[in-house]
Amino acid sequence: MTTKPSHQSALIETNVRWLRQALRLVGSLDDTAYATTPRGLSPHRAGAHLRHILEFYRCFLEGLESSHVDYDARRRDDTIEYSRDAASAAIRSIIRTLETSRDLHQERIIWVRMEDADSDAVREGFMESSISRELQVLSSHTVHHFALIAITLRTHGVELDSDFGMAPSTLRYLASKTAEAA
């Protein structure tokens, strides 16, 4: 299985860019906005969504050596959920690994488990995937949770860039609609 190195590098860079955005966001928040559930949005906290994002990255990176990534084996580390310092440290560590891991540049088949269905057949096995496919999954998953973080933070009255939590394809679509209207 091969992927052009430039494509693989672009996927890594995209994920690093999302994580740097998360790092800037965490640095801009106070503890209340980061760790408190807005009224009526339980259990949604910015910190809980960020913890979830980071645990997916950890599962992916930790599973590369064995070629078995188990997204269901998340640690659910509450420290990251409530501590901006712990979240920042985890983000920096993941960025470093993404930027330096040789495994990420060697496309190959990997096996992935993620329980998305209430079926014993799904729970028991791993599905075939690839490094580039999982990098794409991580990117999409991150943007999806950024959108939920944006809702949570805006409920707290936090000002965010209007494009925070929007997928690149959505931003391109909106830009094309704006260009058409002009």
Question: What is the meaning of each model-derived region?
Answer:
Residues 103-123:
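Carboxylate-rich helix-loop segments that flank metal/cofactor sites and access channels
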Residues 1-23:
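Extreme N-terminal tail/first-helix region
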Residues 6-11, 34-55, 73-89, 124-141, ...:
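Alpha-helical scaffold segments that form or flank carboxylate-/histidine-based iron centers
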Residues 18-28, 56, 90, 145-148:
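Amphipathic, well-ordered alpha-helical segments in soluble domains
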